[in-house]
Every structure is written in structure tokens, then in C-alpha cells.
Amino acid sequence: MSRMYDLRQKEVINTNDGARYGFVSDLVIDEAEGKIKTLIVPGPGRVLGVFGRDQEYRIPWSKIKKIGEDIVLVECETNKILVENDD
């Protein structure tokens, strides 16, 4: 079993093209089902999830292929998961 802290320590990598998205900064949880729906990773150019562009990667849980000791492997198209931050 993993905790949020554990996920934040893992780098997210796309198996399609080897892109390194960064580290998990947040989760979207479906409260009705009690399941994680989406992993959120700060977009390109962001430092510590704070400074930089106002974009983020929103990776649906269904796109996660493997959670390893140090990394999270995902299989998705970058242009479909890189979105404007709505905060």
C-alpha cells in the first residue's frame, strides 16, 4: 500500500516517448467511489509546483501502467493530458 507522501517521491514517466513529467503534486479523488481518478503533476517550466507556466499534467488513473519503487509509468499522449491549471 502507498501513501500520498510515497507517490510524491516518485517520478512520472511516459512509456510512449520516455517523457519525464516530474513528480506528483496532487490527486483528484472520486469521493462517491472512494477511488483516485487523476494524478496531477506540475506542467513544464514550473518550479516546486509554484513558479512558472500555469499548466499541469492531469493523468487519468486508467493510464497508469505500473507504480514502481522510484517511478510511476504511464501510457498516454502528452497533448491530451497537459491542460491549463484551473485553480
Range-by-range predicted roles:
Residues 1-87:
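Peripheral interaction segments used for macromolecular assembly
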